[in-house]
């Protein structure tokens, strides 16, 4: 179910608002976003957004990317200590399965939080090179964070467990996936 984060009725917002007020802290969580007029207004020019996508000729292939806008995003919302929506971040680099329902977000962003500093929220695949076809040496997200002196990087994600790890993990759920750790 796609949610509009600007309607205080969304399930994710209601949960985060309750948690943030109870704990008096900032809370971030991912959710599937239905684009609203407010969403599209936020896509105007800004000095804190960075479109890290590469020109087509720099990638081997971008065939898995959507050809038509879907008006939906793989997003994460930041809710403040008073329970109010502070910002919505949208996944910039889509994983293949995301392209079946979501559009690419407009770019990496950050927000200044009082007494905390610059916070960047990126989602899962944003950590990888764009479309997995460009060089792993480009480090788009970390370059953005370094260039903008980001203090905190928050990354909600749902890592896929390598098939060879499934039996091992089921034996001892407290043990990490070594191939995943080695990948990063």
Pin down the residues of each PLM region.
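CN hydrolase (nitrilase-like) catalytic-core segments centered on the catalytic cysteine
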Residues: 7-29, 128-184
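Catalytic-core segment of enzymes that process non-peptidic bonds
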Residues: 2-122
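A Trp-anchored, charged/polar loop motif used as the substrate-binding/catalytic surface
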Residues: 101-109, 121-123, 132-146
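Short, solvent-exposed loop/turn segments at secondary-structure junctions
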Residues: 34-35, 93-94, 126-129, 159-161
């Amino acid at each position: 179910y796609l949610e509009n984060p600007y309607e205080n009725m969304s399930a994710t917002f209601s949960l985060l608002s309750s948690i943030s007020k109870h704990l008096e802290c900032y809370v971030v969580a991912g959710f599937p976003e239905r684009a609203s007029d407010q969403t599209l207004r936020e896509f105007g020019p800004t000095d804190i957004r960075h479109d890290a996508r590469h020109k087509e000729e720099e990638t081997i292939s971008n065939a898995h990317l959507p050809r038509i806008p879907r008006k939906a995003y793989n997003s994460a919302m930041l809710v403040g200590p008073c329970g109010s929506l502070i910002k919505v971040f949208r996944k910039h680099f889509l994983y293949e399965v995301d392209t079946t329902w979501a559009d690419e977000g407009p770019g990496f962003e950050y927000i200044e939080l009082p007494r905390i500093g610059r916070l960047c929220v990126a989602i899962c695949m944003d950590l990888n090179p764009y479309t997995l076809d460009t060089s792993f040496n480009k480090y788009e997200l970390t370059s953005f964070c370094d260039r903008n002196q980001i203090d905190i990087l928050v990354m909600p994600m749902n890592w896929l467990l390598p098939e060879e790890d499934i039996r091992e993990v089921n034996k001892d759920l407290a043990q990490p996936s070594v191939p995943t750790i080695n990948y990063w």
